[in-house]
Design a protein with these regions (language model features):
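Core dinuclear metal-dependent hydrolase active-site scaffold
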Residues: 1-63, 122-153
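Cap/insert and terminal regions of metallo-dependent hydrolase folds
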Residues: 48-125
Length: 153
């Protein structure tokens, strides 16, 4: 569907029974005039490979939110290569119990595509903006405002 000049498209697989509830997640591809953003939800690498086989070039995006908060079961080489992002975002809470993002996922991202990697557990809220003159810009809230309690060990 469209919202002004922005198109939103649901990304999903064949819809067969899911062994893993996370694979029931659907993704969202947001395409704006100067950038695109893929939010894959909590899908596993297996579901990502199905998306790549089905959606192919439509998965291309300038910004990729890593699946499942940077879990080691997600963000496959296949997805990274087809999306080909300039930026990768990790949405994870600071000091979360699951240890997200996993080091092997960060290494996989860096080995597969040359991206700028932002992590909400370190950078705080991340804002995305884009203009014809300045192109795509992402800002980190913690570079703008950092309360004292976040600086504690």
């Amino acid at each position: 569907w469209r919202w002004g000049s922005t198109e939103l498209m649901i990304i999903n697989g064949p819809g067969q029974g899911e062994q893993d509830r996370n694979d029931g997640s659907c993704g969202l591809l947001v395409t704006a005039p100067n950038f695109s953003l893929l939010i894959p939800g909590d899908v596993s690498a297996r579901r990502e490979r199905e998306w790549v086989r089905y959606w192919r070039d439509e998965l291309s995006a300038s910004v990729l939110v890593l699946a499942h908060h940077g879990s080691r079961t997600s963000t496959s080489h296949a997805l990274l290569k087809w999306v080909g992002p300039e930026w990768a975002l990790i949405s994870a809470g600071r000091g979360n119990a699951f240890g997200h993002p996993h080091r092997e996922v960060i290494d996989r991202v860096r080995q597969t595509v040359p991206v700028s990697l932002l992590d909400t557990s370190k950078d705080g809220a991340i804002s995305i903006s884009s203009t014809d003159q300045q192109g795509l810009q992402l800002s980190r809230e913690r570079t703008v405002w950092s309360p004292y309690w976040l600086k504690l060990p």
